[in-house]
């Protein structure tokens, strides 16, 4: 079997690199056989920084540069340096900007500082991630009123990964496990301005997931955790609570975290209008 092609992908931006990274990763989805080493160079705004990047690049390897750079002089310098070493250097936004400029017959602004907006978005996302991690699995509910979204569900219904995914999108999320015979420590029925969503799942699939969990934890004596009647009662109680309060409920059976999160975002967007 031949060795895979290894590509050193250098992502360069005068801001956070999130835009160029998203485009690059999407493009590389079309090359599954390629092994990618990703190097992220953010907040690059000087000739000296570009010189340092070039010094770190292993010239005898496959290298590829993708960038977003709004300062014309810095951008030209980057392309010049890449050209000297015969490294492909691709601007991900230039073609789009050029097409808009030609279509409208308007010149683009010579310089526009996008770093402020991106930085605001970045720090909002970091704040959402920190908040969501601190409020995983029903923890720290004293400031639940600061959440954008509250997720309820029995154990192993993808509450935590869905919450983290939403946090990465900038939503502050609390997830709370619903456990039989244990009352919630907060009265969610009074939180009229919050999106509260319940997650449910096919009982056979849930038991299968829980059994695998017990095996991985070497704790196969927790019979109630996988008992059919007990699990059925948990699922029914979740549906009952959501129906009583008019909260939407999502069946996560065979759904990816991305699909679950997309549905929740749709509910959230609808609630805001």
From Swiss-Prot:
EC number: 2.7.11.32, 2.7.4.27
Catalyzed chemical reaction(s): N(tele)-phospho-L-histidyl/L-threonyl-[pyruvate, phosphate dikinase] + ADP = N(tele)-phospho-L-histidyl/O-phospho-L-threonyl-[pyruvate, phosphate dikinase] + AMP + H(+); N(tele)-phospho-L-histidyl/O-phospho-L-threonyl-[pyruvate, phosphate dikinase] + phosphate + H(+) = N(tele)-phospho-L-histidyl/L-threonyl-[pyruvate, phosphate dikinase] + diphosphate
Domain of life the protein comes from: Bacteria
Molecular function terms, GO-annotated: ADP binding; ATP binding; phosphotransferase activity, phosphate group as acceptor; protein serine/threonine kinase activity
InterPro entries on file: Kinase-pyrophosphorylase (IPR005177), PPDK_reg (IPR026565)
Keyword Transferase: yes
Signal sequence bounds: none
Keywords, ordered alphabetically: Kinase, Nucleotide-binding, Serine/threonine-protein kinase, Transferase
Binding site for ADP: 153-160
A Pfam family: Kinase-PPPase
Chain's role: Bifunctional serine/threonine kinase and phosphorylase involved in the regulation of the pyruvate, phosphate dikinase (PPDK) by catalyzing its phosphorylation/dephosphorylation.
Protein family (similarity comment): Belongs to the pyruvate, phosphate/water dikinase regulatory protein family. PDRP subfamily.
HAMAP family recorded: PDRP (MF_00921)
UniProt-recorded name of the protein: Putative pyruvate, phosphate dikinase regulatory protein
């Amino acid at each position: 079997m031949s060795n895979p092609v290894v590509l050193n992908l250098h992502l360069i931006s005068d801001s956070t690199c999130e835009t160029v990274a998203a485009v690059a990763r999407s493009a590389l989805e079309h090359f599954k056989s390629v092994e990618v080493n990703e190097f992220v160079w953010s907040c690059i705004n000087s000739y000296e920084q570009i010189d340092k990047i070039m010094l770190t690049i292993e010239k005898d390897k496959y290298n590829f540069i993708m960038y977003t750079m709004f300062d014309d002089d810095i951008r030209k310098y980057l392309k010049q340096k890449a050209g000297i070493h015969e490294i492909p250097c691709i601007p991900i936004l230039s073609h789009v900007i050029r097409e808009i400029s030609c279509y409208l017959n308007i010149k683009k602004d010579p310089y526009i500082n996008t770093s402020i907006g991106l930085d605001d978005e970045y720090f909002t996302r970091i704040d959402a991630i920190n908040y969501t991690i601190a409020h995983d699995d029903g923890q720290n509910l004293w400031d639940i009123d600061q959440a954008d979204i509250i997720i309820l569900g029995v154990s192993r219904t993808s509450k935590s990964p869905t919450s983290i995914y939403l946090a990465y999108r900038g939503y502050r999320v609390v997830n709370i496990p619903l456990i039989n015979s244990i009352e919630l420590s907060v009265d969610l029925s009074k939180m009229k301005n919050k999106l509260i969503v319940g997650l449910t799942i096919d009982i056979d699939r849930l038991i299968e997931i829980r059994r695998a969990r017990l095996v991985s934890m070497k704790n196969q004596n927790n019979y109630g955790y996988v008992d059919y009647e007990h699990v059925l009662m948990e699922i029914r109680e979740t549906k009952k609570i959501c129906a009583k309060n008019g909260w939407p409920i999502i069946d996560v059976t065979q759904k990816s975290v991305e699909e679950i999160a997309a549905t929740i975002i749709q509910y959230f967007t609808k609630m805001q209008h």
